[in-house]
């Protein structure tokens, strides 16, 4: 399926919204702990993991690195670049999004005893996570703040006039 067919909507997330949503996720996770530490799925889980680590006073943060996206194209294979030892008992896994479930499924296989939490979840990925904050439709591209930037736009009065 092409990108144009797959994503019909865009959901832009600001830094402030991501922080609010990660903090809301922290509230949900607080009663489910304590945790030995956090395993952040890089790269998308790094920022939410930092917020959650602060809110839950967790000082041990590991990463698991899996490559699966090139802009809006999700590759068919997931490449594990870095993993962690064990089965995940007592650990909290954090990612930004459970989309098709490919990454979540792979991490679940590696760390079946961990608690898996994401800030956002789509219908296909939702069954693979234990805790999340916001569900987004499968045909929506979530535009995270690290994938965008604020740019200066020339005021209309200063733009060249079209005849």
Curated annotation (Swiss-Prot):
According to UniProt, the reaction catalysed is: GMP + diphosphate = guanine + 5-phospho-alpha-D-ribose 1-diphosphate; XMP + diphosphate = xanthine + 5-phospho-alpha-D-ribose 1-diphosphate; IMP + diphosphate = hypoxanthine + 5-phospho-alpha-D-ribose 1-diphosphate
What residues bind xanthine, as annotated?
99, 142
Name the domain of life this protein comes from. Bacteria
The residues that hold GMP are 99-103, 141-142
Cite the annotated pathway.
Purine metabolism; GMP biosynthesis via salvage pathway; GMP from guanine: step 1/1; Purine metabolism; XMP biosynthesis via salvage pathway; XMP from xanthine: step 1/1
- What EC number(s) does the entry state? 2.4.2.-, 2.4.2.22
Q: Where does guanine bind?
A: 99, 142
Q: GO cellular component annotations, sorted alphabetically? A: plasma membrane
Root EC class: transferase
Q: Which cofactor does it need?
A: Mg(2+)
- GO terms assigned for molecular function: guanine phosphoribosyltransferase activity; hypoxanthine phosphoribosyltransferase activity; metal ion binding; xanthine phosphoribosyltransferase activity
Tell me how this protein sits in the membrane.
Answer: Peripheral membrane protein
Gene Ontology biological-process annotations: GMP salvage; purine ribonucleoside salvage; XMP salvage
Query: Which residues of the sequence carry a binding annotation for 5-phospho-alpha-D-ribose 1-diphosphate?
Result: 43-44, 95-103
Q: Does the keyword Cell inner membrane apply?
A: yes
Location(s) in or outside the cell: Cell inner membrane
- Where Mg(2+) binds, per the record, is at 96
Subunit = Homotetramer.
Instruction: Give the function comment from the record.
Output: Purine salvage pathway enzyme that catalyzes the transfer of the ribosyl-5-phosphate group from 5-phospho-alpha-D-ribose 1-diphosphate (PRPP) to the N9 position of the 6-oxopurines guanine and xanthine to form the corresponding ribonucleotides GMP (guanosine 5'-monophosphate) and XMP (xanthosine 5'-monophosphate), with the release of PPi. To a lesser extent, also acts on hypoxanthine.
Belongs to which family? Answer: Belongs to the purine/pyrimidine phosphoribosyltransferase family. XGPT subfamily.
Q: What is this protein called?
A: Xanthine-guanine phosphoribosyltransferase
- Give the organism, scientific name: Nitratidesulfovibrio vulgaris (strain ATCC 29579 / DSM 644 / CCUG 34227 / NCIMB 8303 / VKM B-1760 / Hildenborough)
Q: Which taxonomic lineage does the organism of this UniProt entry have?
A: Bacteria, Pseudomonadati, Thermodesulfobacteriota, Desulfovibrionia, Desulfovibrionales
- Give the gene that encodes this protein: gpt
């Amino acid at each position: 399926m092409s990108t144009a067919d797959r994503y019909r909507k865009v959901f832009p997330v600001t830094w402030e919204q991501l922080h609010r949503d990660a903090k809301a996720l922290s509230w949900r996770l607080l009663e489910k702990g304590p945790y030995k530490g956090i395993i952040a799925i890089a790269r998308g889980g790094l920022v939410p993991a930092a917020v959650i680590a602060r809110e839950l006073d967790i000082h041990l943060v590991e990463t698991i690195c899996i490559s699966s996206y090139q802009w809006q194209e999700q590759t068919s294979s997931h490449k594990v670049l870095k993993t962690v030892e064990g089965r995940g008992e007592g650990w909290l896994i954090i990612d930004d999004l459970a989309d098709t479930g490919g990454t979540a499924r792979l991490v679940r296989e590696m760390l079946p005893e961990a608690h898996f939490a994401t800030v956002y979840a789509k219908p296909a990925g939702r069954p693979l996570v234990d805790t999340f904050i916001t569900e987004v439709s499968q045909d929506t591209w979530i535009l995270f703040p690290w994938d965008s930037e604020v740019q200066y736009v020339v005021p209309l009065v200063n733009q060249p006039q079209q005849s």
